[in-house]
């Protein structure tokens, strides 16, 4: 069973970290502007936030960039992160991956977990910096130790596949677990596969079912298919082919070819559902189009239908192919 791949870069903004005092006039826009002009880094950062979000002022991305830069150059960590995010993914300015990496690094060194995570992804992908999987692992670890679930997940992938660090399936399971317990769907799925296959941990069908269910309930189609298999075979859970079909159907509707084929088989044999050869044909057909179908079973199903039924089945198959091909 395949596992999920690396997570993508997250975008997030840090807002004011300046404590409010009883003198609220000190935090009025004119007061912030005056303080910023006098060189106060926290005020410069505040002004950058206001201009970026159009908070109490007309939105002005260029001014936001200027004020973040002033604060960042004075060592303000949140300003450094926001500046990096602007260079990395703000549609209103020209993207500059190298500058993004420069400022992510500044903020990461100061301990901001999002900066550490995004810096790790930059090293992993060679985006704005020479690709370096070892450095990616270093920064995933830093962010993961602070509880960043995406970093924990990517660190687990690194251990699982031996990318940038010696392969260690047990450590992969440790980090998948940390991310999974925070609700990370892909980590839940990969942890389930680890329990299912006994990789890095003793095989445990019931724990595999537990984590497949967690991921499946979040819409992970691979987990939905695998959970269907567990119910179909009574592995780690009481055998229930009706529930198996429910999970196959959820995954099939999301374009999972294996689930489409599994659902077709159950329609063909009437397992957990009333036998329906037209449905079987249609699901076999879309599964074949997705590269996961049993072509022999598709032909076998076609032979079991009369001409009129086959014509209807082909129309149904065409509609399924239009809707449920894998993206």
State the predicted function of each range.
Residues 14-16:
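N-terminal signal peptide c-region/cleavage motif recognized by signal peptidases
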Residues 6, 10, 24-27, 289-327:
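Terminal, low-structured helical/coil segments at or just beyond the last alpha-helical repeat
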Residues 45, 66, 81, 102, ...:
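TPR/TPR-like alpha-solenoid signature
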Residues 46-53, 82-89, 118-125, 154-161, ...:
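Hydrophobic face of amphipathic alpha-helices that form TPR/SEL1-like repeat modules
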Residues 21-55, 70:
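N-terminal segments that cap or nucleate solenoid repeat domains
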Residues 37-40, 53-55, 60, 73-76, ...:
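Short helix-capping/linker turns of helical repeat alpha-solenoids
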């Amino acid at each position: 069973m395949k596992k999920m791949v690396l997570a993508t870069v997250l975008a997030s903004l840090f807002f004011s970290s300046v404590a409010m005092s009883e003198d609220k006039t000190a935090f009025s826009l004119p007061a912030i502007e005056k303080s910023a002009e006098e060189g106060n880094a926290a005020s410069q950062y505040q002004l950058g936030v206001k201009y970026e979000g159009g908070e109490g002022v007309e939105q002005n991305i260029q001014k936001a960039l200027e004020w973040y830069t002033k604060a960042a150059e004075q060592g303000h960590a949140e300003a450094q992160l926001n500046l990096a995010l602007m260079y990395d993914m703000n549609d209103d300015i020209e993207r500059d991956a190298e500058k993004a990496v420069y400022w992510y690094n500044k903020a990461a060194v100061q301990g901001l977990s999002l900066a550490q995570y995004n810096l790790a992804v930059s090293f992993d992908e060679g985006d704005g910096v020479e690709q370096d999987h070892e450095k990616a692992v270093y920064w995933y670890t830093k962010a993961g130790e602070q509880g960043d679930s995406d970093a924990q997940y990517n660190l687990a992938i690194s251990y699982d596949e031996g990318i940038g660090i010696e392969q260690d399936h047990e450590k992969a399971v440790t980090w998948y677990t940390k991310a999974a317990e925070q609700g990370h769907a892909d980590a839940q799925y990969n942890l389930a596969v680890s329990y299912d296959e006994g990789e890095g941990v003793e095989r445990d069908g019931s724990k595999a079912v537990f984590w497949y269910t967690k991921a499946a309930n979040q819409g992970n189609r691979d987990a939905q298919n695998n959970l269907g298999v567990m119910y179909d075979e009574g592995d780690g859970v009481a055998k229930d082919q009706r529930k198996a079909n429910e999970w196959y159907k959820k995954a099939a509707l999301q374009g999972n070819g294996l689930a489409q084929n599994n659902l077709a088989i159950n329609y063909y044999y009437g397992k957990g559902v009333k036998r329906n050869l037209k449905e079987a044909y249609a699901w076999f057909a879309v599964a074949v189009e997705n590269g996961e179908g049993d072509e022999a079973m598709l032909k076998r199903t076609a032979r079991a239908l009369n001409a009129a039924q086959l014509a209807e089945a082909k129309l149904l198959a065409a509609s399924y192919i239009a809707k449920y091909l894998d993206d």
